[in-house]
Amino acid sequence: MTDEQLEIVSRLWTEEHISFNGKFYNFKDVAFYPKPIQQPRIPIWVGGEGIHAHRRTAKYGDAWFPYFVEISPGELKAGYDNVQRLASEAGRDPEQILFTCCRQIEVTHQPVPQDERHLCGTPEQLVEALNAYREIGVKHLALQFMVPRWPDRVEQIERFAHEVMPHLRD
């Protein structure tokens, strides 16, 4: 179903009138206006970490965006390499697919044992852990601060902005 949806949306954004005959959607001569300002269309970021998401990204995506997953940088890189291989097999330029991800993060006051599948630790530990994503080629890293109470979450974000981000700038 998602593959059909991505194909339909992409075509609606780029073609004047479309017809579609699929397993889940069937229609004739449909138009969509206004068209997006972005050319050729709004970028499509495909989420998910499994083979179906890899194939979907390779065929339709402008970015692979595994969201909210427990995954090591090495596993993430292997997934992206697979996306690029599949894109090449589909006749697309694999370098045109952006390497992105979303990770959970927690800034602590005391050092904690490190696990490459989790971003948790002091600012110093996080700088080191986050550099691993840069080293494997991630171009966009979204962070989800995993603290349940709002005031604590604000503190996490502020600490990250002041104590971690300055060390990640080129």
Predicted feature descriptions by range:
Residues 1-170:
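Active-site-adjacent structural elements that line small-molecule/cofactor binding pockets in enzymes
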